[in-house]
Design a protein with these regions (language model features):
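Bulky hydrophobic segments
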Residues: 1-109, 119-148
Length: 148
């Protein structure tokens, strides 16, 4: 059973293929960055992939039918993304020896930066999403009905 109210606007069918394509692009950037050692050649690559990941996870959270997206709960989305990012950082720490040899101090700094960028990416998306819902509640992006 969905936790959205009956008056919530449905997500249009074209949003899902776009979100899946976006997610695949972010995965390709991440794993391509590992495979071709882009992370070590471009200092900003990690920032790019984490900010794009934060945007993508926030989009999934906002567009899933079981996720309530009223203004009060919209504030929580970046915090949930931060928690998911923290989980990923634990995974990364456990398996880092396979692809990188960092000191613990450097890893702690990198983790902090990654989590900030995850949070900022999510905050950017939720701010855009919240404003879009507020200004155009029946917009083409957020509803299957045509815009007024």
């Amino acid at each position: 059973m969905s936790s959205r109210s009956p008056t919530s606007t449905p997500t249009p069918s074209f949003a899902w293929p776009l979100l899946v394509a976006y997610s695949l692009l972010v995965c390709a950037l991440h794993f391509g960055g590992l495979q071709y050692e882009i992370y070590t050649r471009l200092w900003w690559w990690d920032l790019l992939t984490h900010s794009l990941s934060g945007i993508g996870v926030a989009a999934w959270l906002c567009l899933l039918p079981v996720t309530p997206v009223d203004a009060t709960r919209l504030v929580a989305v970046p915090l949930v993304v931060l928690a998911i990012g923290a989980g990923f950082e634990v995974y990364e720490f456990l398996f880092k020896d396979f692809y990188v040899e960092w000191t613990t101090a450097y890893y702690a700094f990198d983790t902090a930066v990654d989590l900030v960028v995850d949070f900022l990416g999510a905050a950017v998306f939720t701010r855009w999403y919240g404003r879009r819902r507020q200004s155009q509640p029946s917009s083409v992006l957020l509803s299957s009905e045509p815009a007024d």
